[in-house]
Swiss-Prot record:
Keyword Isomerase appears in the UniProt entry: yes
Superkingdom of origin organism: Bacteria
Pfam family, one: PrpF
Keywords noted in UniProt: Isomerase
Gene3D superfamilies: Diaminopimelate Epimerase, Chain A, domain 1
Keyword Protein biosynthesis found: no
Protein name: Putative isomerase YbhH
NCBIfam families, sorted: OMA_tautomer
Annotated family: Belongs to the PrpF family.
GO MF term (any one): isomerase activity
PANTHER family noted in UniProt: ACONITATE ISOMERASE-RELATED, ISOMERASE YBHH-RELATED
Signal peptide (from-to): none
Assigned EC number: 5.-.-.-
């Protein structure tokens, strides 16, 4: 049987396989077949692979040394679909980004400095650039630490991620429809593309409080059908075309915060509710809190830049927004995440 080197890592509130691009075929079709075999795609439990039967654990990060002078490494994210044999490389994944720097250092793609190594990452999916500050005392990656993130038990070393050019990652525009508010099925929404194209929907317009647990929302098939109808219309309006076989745009239900944050959210991936919150989605949501005229601003009257706390089913996530320019195209977003190396070895291919 053929085998390739593989590292399994938790990145933020996601988990997946980290692979070097040199160990995979350049042909996309052949590459995707290998990724599906590794994860066990096409089975609800992903029983024949290392995927966990959930979108949050059926992810792959493909890493290589970058040819772009603005980056040290290239990172291609692959969402391996659980229930069908398909791979989507359209979006970025900010949680998996948390492990890219450590993986790159430990695989010799960039030399470590002490006490912190800044790894410049180019996300191949979106063309965006991210800086990851990895704890490397004495030139060695440190995984243990005191940082805690909601949705993950225990503590670990902090990884600071700064998104340098998040505006219009897939569509070229912050507001791809040229409107701050659009109406689909008579529901007001905001379509925004900051790190991730999302369609933001006030929960009350779908007959929900927005505080329901993910399992309750996932069981409501009528709700999921309404969300998908809005998502498909939003995708076309955002210039993404027919998104029925794409995981973007991601739908987000919003409601007033309950625990002192700026906003409460339920983030969909896109057909099931995230147990916490995607980093890229959090950047889009926080941007909608700061920018005028959005449906979010009808709930959050005034936030501005700085730290924006977003409540989600597992707790909350802080995004720090800064802007040295005059409009949203120059927004920078920073988050603190953690990562853990779970195993390093070889994965066998059927």
């Amino acid at each position: 049987m053929k085998k390739i080197p593989c590292v399994m890592m938790r990145g933020g509130t996601s988990r997946g396989a980290f692979l070097l691009a040199e160990h995979l075929p350049e042909d996309q079709t052949q590459r995707d077949k290998i990724l599906m075999a590794i994860m066990g795609s096409g089975n609800d439990l992903e029983i024949d692979g290392i995927g966990g039967g959930n979108p949050l654990t059926s992810k792959v990060a493909i890493i290589s040394r970058s040819s772009d002078p603005r980056a040290d490494v290239d990172y291609l994210f692959a969402q391996v679909i659980v229930h069908e044999q398909r791979v989507d490389t359209t979006p970025n994944c900010g949680n998996m980004l948390s492990g890219v720097g450590a993986f790159a250092i430990e695989n010799g793609l960039i030399a470590a400095t002490s006490p912190v190594t800044r790894v410049r990452i180019r996300n191949v999916n979106t063309g965006t650039f991210i800086e990851a500050d990895v704890q490397t005392p004495n030139g060695v990656v440190e995984y243990e630490g005191s940082a805690r993130i909601d949705g993950v038990p225990g503590t670990a070393a902090p990884v600071a991620l700064t998104f340098l050019n998040a505006a219009g990652t897939k569509t070229g525009k912050v507001f791809p429809t040229d409107n701050q508010i659009d109406y689909f099925d008579d529901v007001p929404v905001t379509c925004i593309d900051m790190a991730m194209p999302v369609v933001i929907i006030p929960a009350e317009y779908l007959g929900k409080t927005g505080y329901e647990l993910p399992a309750e929302l996932d069981a409501d098939k009528a709700l999921l059908a309404r969300i998908e109808s809005i998502r498909l219309q939003a995708g076309k309006a955002m210039g993404l075309g027919d998104v029925s076989n794409m995981v973007i745009p991601k739908p987000v239900l919003i409601s007033p915060a309950q625990k002192g944050g700026a906003i409460n959210v339920r983030y969909f991936m896109p057909h099931s509710c995230h147990r916490a919150l995607a980093i890229t989605g959090a950047i889009a949501i926080s941007s909608s809190c700061a920018l005028e005229g959005t449906v979010t601003r009808q709930i959050v009257p005034s936030v501005g830049y700085g730290n924006i706390n977003i409540e989600h089913p597992s707790g909350a996530l802080d995004v720090h927004l800064s802007n040295e320019g005059q409009d949203a195209t120059t927004l920078r977003a920073s988050v603190i995440r953690t990562t853990r190396k779970i195993f390093s070895g070889e994965v066998y291919l059927p």
